[in-house]
Amino acid sequence: MPSDRAATPKPSYKRILLKLSGEALMGDGKYGISPKTLSAIAGDVKDCVDLGVEVALTIGGGNIFRGVSGATEGMDRSSADYMGMLATVINAMALQDALEKIGVNTRVQSAIEMHQVAEPYIRRRAIRHLEKGRVVIFAAGTGNPYFTTDTAASLRAMEIHADVLLKATKVDGVYTDDPKKNPAATKFKQLSYIDVLKKNLKVMDSTAISLCMDNDLPIIVFDSTLRGNVRRVVLGEQIGTTVGRLEEK
């Protein structure tokens, strides 16, 4: 009789970094955190953990405060960015709570030290948590102003030796144009890093893309609003758009 272990699908990746936007936590709201959406995201993460995948996350803070927007309104850019970093800590703590409620051991590591609520970011400790099966949520971006949480995600993914960076969005990949505004827009199945930069495609900011390109870290852009999509990507299903170093023919 085959064992349950034998029936478990084999994931394509051992260690992943999942990048979530702050807006992903809002659900249908216009601000803040939707408990229902938070629970759904936690469930998707648990599905990956149950497959034996080591999961790290980086979360934005745009559902609470966006540094660039604050700077546009006349606020000092550094101050605005630090406020945005603090917003990511709130989101990280919320997701940690949602994960631990469903039995997933989780640690939050903040690039800005605040010992009462999170561990400081220590690369070796983060890797050790992952090896022990804990989920690690990286908060406060890089800890420096002028750097996006996309860049922080790329940096952390490389530091922990992630196999892939999963960029969660509200659309099912990268398109030639905004599919919500232009019905004729077509989706890319694959893109090279250079194509993303040359065509100025809104995958991630250019610093984040360049970091991934320089270190051969593949990026998969996919729709995270559909329950189970994170698991599908981890199992190697061809959904979304893959950004990488395409082989020349």
Curated annotation (Swiss-Prot):
Inhibited by UTP. GO terms for cellular component: cytoplasm. It is an enzyme of class 2 (transferase). ATP binds at K19, L20, S21, G22, G62, R66, T169, Y175, D178. The keyword Nucleotide-binding applies. One of its GO terms (biological process) is UDP biosynthetic process. It holds the Pfam family AA_kinase. Its EC number is 2.7.4.22. The keyword Ion transport does not apply. Keywords: ATP-binding, Cytoplasm, Kinase, Nucleotide-binding, Pyrimidine biosynthesis, Transferase. Its main location: cytoplasm. Homohexamer. Catalyzes the reversible phosphorylation of UMP to UDP. This is Uridylate kinase. It comes from Anaeromyxobacter sp. (strain Fw109-5).
